[in-house]
């Protein structure tokens, strides 16, 4: 598509170059630029895309979109100006790739906890209902026969629109997508209208210099999803649901356990354990449902998926089958071992998620509840204090270690976690083992019959980042290999 057609009514202005320049792709990473690419210069806190424009052109980019002119670009390179490059990038990518979101039923899931599990449960239900479903989120992007890792829960708009195009071309009619607050703030999901939006819950998270300024801003961006939905599905038990729903024009459908709701589960849900798999069973309108994940929060996630599925017209048989059969990598994921104790791997990496998980595991009455965890480098220090505090309060023994330290010294991170441990319960015993692999070995070597070992923070991730270098690190494999040696 040429620049003239591509930029029509987008607010972009051609500063110089040929309006008939053909564009075949849109990117914001100069390393991904190639012949026919439109490179979008995104300003950022730590790096400015304008500084990489020449590199993108050298790689073959046919045009550059900027907020201001970039000196030194070759004469043959077309240069576009836009006041809001993120909005412009979303509009241009959607147009170039043929507005793929319009060809599918789009479902967005947002909230502090439960996005990934709810999205996977809903996708499983819709697949059981006969739909061809794509899934985008923290665990990557997948559709039948395809799977790719992602750098963000919600990818940059140029990447997202291309992925949606590939889904449509491969026959997908539905897409379930986790929509993060940062994805909304940075317009990664712009140009997408959602048939259904799902709100799971809200608690303080992603607050810091590189994320949200405060909780009010975090809430603002969470509710932004529902300004682009035809139907909103809301957790009516969440204390912030009133603020999330305030002033919205979409049709609202609520779910819950404690408060009156359109879809309400009985409060007498049961914990289940079969074949080493922890689960729960609950009742809605006299019908019994099972979900293969433990605890109250799994009931809430299943209720969210059930409610959204009903809004979308899924059959009851599909709802039962999808909820019972779904497995989510890195979400209270059991590691099958021939051992008298249980090991679960979970992505819980903030105070709220860790508290929900540990309280749930406590309900299974373990001999000891052992938490193995760290916190990421170059992220909010408040998260470290919170993780340390909640684990000290709810675990019987803590093993603190690294978790994607990035460029920050591990000892600095561990010092913050230790401060959190003292705040939570200074009497809780703990071990400090900076190497995460050795920390896992330590937990396994000292496990007692009836223990539950919860390895927190990385979940589905397949690498660990140290000093800017990512190394292979799959916790399920580490546990299985060490125990089976």
Which residues are covered by each model-predicted region?
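N-terminal leader/targeting and accessory segments in enzymes
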Residues: 1-91, 95, 227, 239, ...
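Residue-level signal for inorganic ion chemistry
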Residues: 6, 37, 56, 92, ...
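C-terminal helical cap/extension that packs against the catalytic core
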Residues: 5, 9, 64, 68-76, ...
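Phosphate-binding loop of NTP-binding sites
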Residues: 10, 89-236, 240-248, 285, ...
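Short, polar loop motifs at secondary-structure junctions
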Residues: 64-72, 137-140, 236-240, 257-258, ...
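Nucleotide phosphate-binding/pyrophosphate-handling subdomain across enzymes
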Residues: 32, 275-277, 282-397, 419
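Short, flexible loop segments at boundaries between secondary-structure elements
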Residues: 207, 471-485
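Beta-strand->loop->alpha-helix junctions that form or flank phosphate-binding loops
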Residues: 64-68, 249-275, 291-296, 320-324, ...
């Amino acid at each position: 598509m040429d620049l003239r057609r591509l930029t029509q009514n987008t607010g972009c202005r051609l500063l110089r170059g040929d309006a008939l320049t053909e564009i075949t792709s849109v990117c914001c990473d100069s390393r991904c630029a190639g012949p026919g690419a439109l490179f979008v210069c995104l300003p950022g806190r730590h790096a400015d895309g304008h500084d990489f424009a020449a590199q993108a052109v050298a790689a073959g980019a046919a045009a550059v979109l900027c907020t201001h002119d970039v000196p030194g670009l070759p004469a043959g390179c077309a240069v576009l100006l836009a006041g809001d490059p993120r909005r412009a990038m979303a509009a241009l990518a959607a147009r170039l790739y043929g507005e793929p979101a319009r060809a599918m039923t789009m479902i967005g899931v947002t909230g502090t906890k439960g996005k990934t599990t709810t999205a996977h449960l809903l996708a499983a239900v819709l697949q059981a209902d006969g739909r061809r479903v794509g899934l985008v989120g923290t665990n990557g992007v997948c559709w039948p026969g395809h799977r790719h890792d992602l750098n963000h829960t919600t990818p940059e708009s140029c990447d997202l629109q291309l992925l949606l195009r590939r889904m449509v071309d491969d026959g997908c009619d539905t897409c379930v997508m986790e929509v993060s607050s940062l994805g909304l703030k940075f317009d990664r999901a712009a140009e997408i209208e959602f048939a259904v939006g799902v709100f799971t819950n809200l608690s303080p998270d992603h607050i810091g210099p590189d994320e949200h300024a405060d909780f009010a801003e975090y809430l603002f961006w969470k509710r932004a999803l529902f300004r682009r939905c035809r139907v909103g599905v809301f957790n009516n038990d969440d204390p912030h649901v009133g603020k999330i729903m305030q002033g919205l024009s979409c049709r609202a459908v609520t779910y819950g356990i404690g408060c009156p709701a359109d879809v309400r589960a009985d409060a007498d849900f049961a914990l289940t354990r079969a074949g080493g798999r922890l689960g729960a069973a609950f009742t809605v309108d006299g019908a019994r449902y099972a979900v293969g994940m433990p605890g109250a929060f799994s009931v809430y996630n299943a209720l969210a998926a059930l409610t959204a599925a009903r809004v979308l017209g899924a059959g009851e048989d599909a709802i039962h089958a999808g909820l019972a059969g779904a497995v989510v990598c890195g979400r209270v994921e059991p590691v099958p071992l021939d051992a008298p104790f249980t090991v679960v791997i979970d992505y819980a990496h903030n105070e709220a998620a860790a508290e929900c998980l540990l309280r749930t595991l406590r309900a299974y009455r373990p001999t000891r509840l052992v938490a193995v965890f760290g916190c990421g480098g170059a992220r909010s220090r408040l998260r470290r204090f919170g993780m340390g505090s909640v684990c000290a309060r709810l675990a019987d023994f803590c093993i603190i270690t690294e978790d994607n330290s990035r460029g920050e010294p591990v000892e600095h991170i561990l010092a913050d976690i230790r401060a959190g441990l003292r705040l939570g319960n200074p009497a809780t015993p703990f071990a400090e083992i900076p190497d995460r692999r050795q920390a896992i070995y330590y937990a396994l070597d000292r496990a007692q019959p009836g223990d539950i070992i919860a390895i927190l923070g990385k979940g589905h991730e397949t690498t660990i980042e140290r000093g800017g270098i990512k190394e292979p690190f799959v916790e399920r494999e580490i546990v299985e290999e060490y125990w089976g040696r």
